[in-house]
Amino acid sequence: MTFHELLNEAKERLYQAGQGEQAAQVLMVEYCRQRNINLYMEMDQPMPEDLEVDYLEAVHKMELGQPLGYVLGYECFYGYDFKVNEDVLIPRPETEELVGLVLSLYDDKFSDKENVQVFDVATGSGAIGISLNLEEPKLNVICTDTVSYTH
């Protein structure tokens, strides 16, 4: 099957599963990016068999209700990619607003201080604490969680 045919099939399958058609496009773009395939140049070409198998397996996981972030293994948060799996919650867009609010409060009230401590308790993927520290290196961010292993 061509990239185009597989994309159309995946769109229909995910639409029927209530996941939305856009996830099929995101999956295909990401899987092609990982393999240095220019999707837009290859749309009418047959998809390599190994990629087809991986892509359809990912579509099937989403049909079963697995979120896109878990299927891809990462989620974008505040412009940064964070590893996610079933052990952590996927960061939500609303939480990005929280990071923006904390950074704004820092600018308004604490920017003249040299050592401002921030604690990110139950950090999960680390998205909040790491994003805060990347955006404002003056913050001394401490992240903690109860999970004692990593993947």
Predicted regions and their residues:
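Non-catalytic accessory regions of SAM-dependent methyltransferases
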Residues: 1-40, 44-47
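Conserved AdoMet
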Residues: 29-105
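Alpha-helix termini
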Residues: 105-113
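Conserved class I S-adenosyl-L-methionine
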Residues: 114-122
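Conserved SAM-binding loop of SAM-dependent methyltransferases across substrates and taxa
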Residues: 127-137
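Conserved SAM-binding motif I beta-strand of class I
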Residues: 140-145
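Conserved small/polar residues in nucleotide/adenosyl-binding loops
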Residues: 150-151
